[in-house]
Amino acid sequence: DRHKAILDVYKFEYDLAEAEKEFFAAVEFMKEFHLVDSEYVVNHALNAGKTILAEGAQGSLLDVDFGSYPFVTSSNTITAGACTGLGVAPKNIGEVFGIFKAYATRVGSGPFPTELEDEVGERMRQEGREFGSTTGRPRRCGWIDLPALKYAMMINGVTQLIMMKADVLNIFEEILVCTGYEMPDGTLTDQIPFEITDIKV
């Protein structure tokens, strides 16, 4: 009754029978799924000598524990996420393929020392088609950041490195690369600093 009273205040009308019909149709659809305890399926396959390929989503620097907090996602995007997500022991992880772009991109807010907020960055964005596949939101683009790449390789235990989209850089006469950071006190480092917003590259 209270719920209905609130809806009446806002003059919100809905057909409860129709809403229930959609809900129960969804329930019946879900019942068709073949649900399994995936940790058993994956581990039995590994024990049988089969190869499992696990693909992670999002970049390593968006990892909730090891990324550029608070500009991160809500989960672990690094290799360790395969262990917690699949129920696989770390000792069972074999090869780790690190896939990276020949330039850097970022979606949304967060530190981006090599970001190009100029015509070069826009050309890179257009040539690389760096727009969100769902929203069409433009990605921020910049030169590759080698200390960040090395950090990602370290925390993921990368065994094989694969570069993609190198052809995007063919349109540029000059290609720049970040090899380190200059701290506010003038010192140089090749490690990602705790506070990265006030540094020079």
Where are these regions (language model features)?
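Non-transmembrane, aqueous-exposed alpha-helical and coiled segments at domain scale
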Residues: 1-201
